[in-house]
């Protein structure tokens, strides 16, 4: 039993959203292997990639008040001022926006950047432009959240990309969520924007790689203390 437990703990968990896709890929692989080794092995590779895409590893989240953690694995593509999506009703003036681009090899489970109450969730259908383009924030399919935390409101927007065609949300309005806890997933390549008050101290730079729930994007506290607790989730 201890050996099985050790093996189970060593495997990266797969999110349940991926089960149907993995099952389809496995069935296709089995079918192709019976008629063609070459195409069958390609299908096996696709099945493995599909399983890796939906991996959902645990993360260790810093919990000090004032910290804003990355909502997504990926690369910081943009940092600057921008108007948040109109449907969120978050602000009529530009806010600080940090954009994280996720490629098809990143973990695509998204995590809350701060602890707080989910005040609003707003979904908007749209196009599927390259998620790295600035206008993707305005034109693409997206799902936005407003989280009211101890330091005010934070906007988080999941944006579909060229390949991504489905945004999945795990949460509902009125729920309380902790920093680093899972709130959604975007299938097959996408972007996540975080909107913060102007003047918030940014601790990352464009081009930097991020780990959802772990990388500290910003800090509301201008003179932070060194005392930080952590949570694994």
Swiss-Prot record:
Subunit structure: Heterodimer of a large membrane-associated beta subunit and a small pyruvoyl-containing alpha subunit.
Cytoplasm among keywords: no
Its membrane topology: Peripheral membrane protein
Residue numbers carrying Pyruvic acid (Ser): 190
Full protein name: Phosphatidylserine decarboxylase proenzyme
MF term (GO), any: phosphatidylserine decarboxylase activity
Cofactor: pyruvate
Site (Cleavage (non-hydrolytic)): 189-190
Organism: Azorhizobium caulinodans (strain ATCC 43989 / DSM 5975 / JCM 20966 / LMG 6465 / NBRC 14845 / NCIMB 13405 / ORS 571)
Post-translational modification: Is synthesized initially as an inactive proenzyme. Formation of the active enzyme involves a self-maturation process in which the active site pyruvoyl group is generated from an internal serine residue via an autocatalytic post-translational modification. Two non-identical subunits are generated from the proenzyme in this reaction, and the pyruvate is formed at the N-terminus of the alpha chain, which is derived from the carboxyl end of the proenzyme.
Pathway stated in the Swiss-Prot or TrEMBL entry: Phospholipid metabolism; phosphatidylethanolamine biosynthesis; phosphatidylethanolamine from CDP-diacylglycerol: step 2/2
Family affiliation: Belongs to the phosphatidylserine decarboxylase family. PSD-A subfamily.
Gene: psd
GO biological process entries: phosphatidylethanolamine biosynthetic process
GO cellular component: plasma membrane
Catalytic residues in the record: 190
Catalysed reactions, as listed in the record: a 1,2-diacyl-sn-glycero-3-phospho-L-serine + H(+) = a 1,2-diacyl-sn-glycero-3-phosphoethanolamine + CO2
Pfam families: PS_Dcarbxylase
Cellular compartments annotated: Cell membrane
InterPro entries with a match to the protein in the record: PS_Dcarbxylase, PSD-A
């Amino acid at each position: 039993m201890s050996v099985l437990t050790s093996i189970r703990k060593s495997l990266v968990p797969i999110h349940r959203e991926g089960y149907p896709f993995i099952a389809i890929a496995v069935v296709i692989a089995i079918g192709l292997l019976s008629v063609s080794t070459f195409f069958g092995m390609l299908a096996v590779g696709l099945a493995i990639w599909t399983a890796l895409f939906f991996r959902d590893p645990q993360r260790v989240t810093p919990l000090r008040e004032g910290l804003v953690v990355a909502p997504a694995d990926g690369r910081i593509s943009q940092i600057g001022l921008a108007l948040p999506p109109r449907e969120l009703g978050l602000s009529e003036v530009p806010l600080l926006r940090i954009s994280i681009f996720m490629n098809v090899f990143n973990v695509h489970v998204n995590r809350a950047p701060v602890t707080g109450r989910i005040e609003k969730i707003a979904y908007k259908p749209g196009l599927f432009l390259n998620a790295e383009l600035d206008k993707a924030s305005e034109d693409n399919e997206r799902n936005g959240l407003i989280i009211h935390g101890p330091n005010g409101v934070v906007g988080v927007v999941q944006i579909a990309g060229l390949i991504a065609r489905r945004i999945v949300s795990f949460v509902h309005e009125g729920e309380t969520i902790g920093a680093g806890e899972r709130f959604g997933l975007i299938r097959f390549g996408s972007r996540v924007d975080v909107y913060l008050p102007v003047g918030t101290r940014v601790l990352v730079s464009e081009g930097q790689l991020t780990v959802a729930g772990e990388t500290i994007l910003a800090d509301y506290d201008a003179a932070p203390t060194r005392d930080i607790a952590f949570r694994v989730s």
